Amino acid sequence: MTLKGRLPRSTNATFLVEVGLNGATALAVYKPERGERPLWDFPPGLFRRELAAYHLSEALGWGLVPLTVQREGPYGEGSLQEFVHADFTQHYFTLCEDPAHRDRLARICAFDLIANNADRKSGHCLLGPDGRIWAIDNGLCFNVDPKLRTVIWDFAGEPLPEAIRDDLRRLVKSGLRPTLSALLEERERATLLSRAKRLAQTGRFPTEGGGERYPWPAV
């Protein structure tokens, strides 16, 4: 793992790195635990929540979060996430204007609801070179207390697509995979499944809750 530089405008220490295997190289985003700013409402080890978000996305079959693994790097243990070569002029507030992205954004919305994402800024939705939208910066998820802060309220009050309901039901019925369970506390696991069950049963995106439901800054 070779450090290429520190990413600007990140609350926690976040680095662009180059990783290699068998002669092949790729860029990745490295978030070491040592670089995390202490929070009163989240325990240390936010990088594990980045990992958990990836495994939840995979368990649902949605593929929203770039490949994320746990690695020992120059600044210690942390998460290593595949770098998205995105069009950084695009973010949620621009992407939501294109009907072609609606299904993908609806899944990100549902994902944030059950993961209890406390920080879904517009800039955390990236448009990849293949036209696929990715959800990044998922470290403030899975709190047992209501923490939802998101800019994605365009679906408020709308029926939940049946495909999303089916995936949520499947998750609840099968339970969490060991790779995901190992990253969360018992109450966090139970709350995650409870939120998924409630959303599937309700069958509708919740209505907007007011100003406190938005992260700051929004982009």
Name every feature range the model reports, one short phrase each.
Residues 1-101, 105-118, 122-123, 129-138:
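Conserved ATP-binding subdomain of kinase catalytic cores across diverse folds
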Residues 6, 20, 43, 128-219:
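C-terminal catalytic region of ATP-dependent kinase domains
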